[in-house]
Amino acid sequence: MDTEALANYLLRQLSLDAEENKLEDLLQRQNEDQESSQEYNKKLLLACGFQAILRKILLDARTRATAEGLREVYPYHIEAATQAFLDSQ
């Protein structure tokens, strides 16, 4: 094998190694993105659950205020609704 053929062979091998490294980097980034996505989904699920709890409490507080003939919800309505929610769990 002459020098030029050897140089071409080595360049091809280096190019293949670079492509393999690019592929490995791409796969690693995809795995990191999937992990980040899973963490985001967990946080989103917790936020949705928290929002549902707050909505339930606020609707109960509004019902309590309406039962008293009031148009506004006062802090004691929210406190009573929160306590009722906690007691039901």
From Swiss-Prot:
Cell location: Nucleus; Chromosome, Centromere, Kinetochore
Coiled-coil segments: none
One GO MF term: centromeric DNA binding
Keywords linked to the UniProt accession: Centromere, Chromosome, Kinetochore, Nucleus
Top-level lineage group: Eukaryota
GO biological process, one term: chromosome segregation
CC per GO annotation: kinetochore; nucleus
Subunit structure: Component of the inner kinetochore constitutive centromere-associated network (CCAN) (also known as central kinetochore CTF19 complex in yeast), which is composed of at least AME1, CHL4, CNN1, CTF3, CTF19, IML3, MCM16, MCM21, MCM22, MHF1, MHF2, MIF2, NKP1, NKP2, OKP1 and WIP1.
Role of this protein: Component of the kinetochore, a multiprotein complex that assembles on centromeric DNA and attaches chromosomes to spindle microtubules, mediating chromosome segregation and sister chromatid segregation during meiosis and mitosis. Component of the inner kinetochore constitutive centromere-associated network (CCAN), which serves as a structural platform for outer kinetochore assembly.
Assigned protein family: Belongs to the CENP-W/WIP1 family.
Protein name per Swiss-Prot or TrEMBL: Inner kinetochore subunit WIP1
Native organism: Saccharomyces cerevisiae (strain ATCC 204508 / S288c)
